[in-house]
């Protein structure tokens, strides 16, 4: 199935290359972009499919949106391969929300962890990788935006009821953990 999809992407990219008179580098960039979109599409189906089966859709969505918006500016560690990404995503966005939502983790614990997360984001964000470097001229702006978004989510969470309050805070905790340099190979930082 994966080879079939990859072959279709390759054929489509070649057609676009010929039609638009693109060089090899532009073709490879376009092909990679299509692969990322397709991979993210399938990952989304898996994560939200599992969350629907577990009756956790809104829990998953709350954590994922908080995580996604902060990650846009904070960046952070990525899984080493696609399989690990699927596994980590199910853990982050289905298992952990289940634990926080159904085991009823206290607000005090979650706010403490989220405030520690804010400090971590303030220190380490944005976290660049070898595959996704961040130009020096963008670093300061991304750091400020990541901190501001984290503060906004902390404020919004004050007005939410349990478990959504804790789930929003969980998104902050997850993205902050992915900022630590220990999750990057030596050549990445």
Swiss-Prot record:
Keyword Hydrolase part of the UniProt annotation: yes
Pfam families, alphabetized: AgrB
Q: Which GO terms describe its cellular component?
A: plasma membrane
List, in alphabetical order, the GO biological process terms annotated in this UniProt record. proteolysis; quorum sensing
Q: Where are the transmembrane segments?
A: 50-70, 83-103, 105-125, 143-163, 164-184
Q: Where in the cell is it found?
A: Cell membrane
Q: Report the membrane topology from the UniProt record.
A: Multi-pass membrane protein
GO molecular function, one example?
A: peptidase activity
State the source organism's domain of life: Bacteria
Q: What is its EC number?
A: 3.4.-.-
UniProt keyword list: Cell membrane, Hydrolase, Membrane, Protease, Quorum sensing, Transmembrane, Transmembrane helix, Virulence
Q: Keyword check for Ribosomal protein, yes or no.
A: no
> Which HAMAP family would you find in this protein's record?
AgrB
Q: Which family does it belong to?
A: Belongs to the AgrB family.
**Function of the protein:** Essential for the production of a quorum sensing system signal molecule, the autoinducing peptide (AIP). This quorum sensing system is responsible for the regulation of the expression of virulence factor genes. Involved in the proteolytic processing of AgrD, the precursor of AIP.
Q: What is this protein called?
A: Accessory gene regulator protein B
Q: Which organism is it from?
A: Staphylococcus saprophyticus subsp. saprophyticus (strain ATCC 15305 / DSM 20229 / NCIMB 8711 / NCTC 7292 / S-41)
Q: Which gene encodes it?
A: agrB
């Amino acid at each position: 199935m994966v080879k079939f999809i990859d072959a279709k992407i390759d054929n489509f990219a070649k057609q676009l290359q010929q039609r638009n008179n693109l060089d090899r580098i532009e073709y490879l960039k376009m092909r990679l972009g299509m692969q990322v979109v397709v991979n993210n599409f399938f990952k989304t189906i898996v994560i939200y499919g599992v969350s629907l089966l577990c009756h956790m859709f809104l829990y998953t969505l709350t954590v994922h949106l908080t995580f996604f918006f902060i990650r846009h500016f904070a960046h952070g560690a990525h899984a080493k391969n696609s399989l690990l990404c699927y596994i980590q995503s199910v853990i982050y966005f289905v298992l952990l929300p289940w634990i926080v939502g159904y085991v009823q983790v206290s607000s005090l614990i979650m706010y403490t962890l989220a405030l520690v997360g804010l400090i971590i984001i303030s220190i380490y964000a944005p976290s660049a990788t070898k595959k996704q470097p961040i130009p020096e001229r963008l670093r300061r702006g991304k750091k400020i935006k990541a901190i501001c978004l984290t503060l906004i989510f902390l404020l919004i969470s004050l007005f939410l009821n349990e478990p959504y309050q804790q789930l929003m805070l969980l998104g902050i905790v997850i993205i902050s953990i992915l900022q630590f340099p220990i999750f990057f190979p030596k050549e990445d930082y």
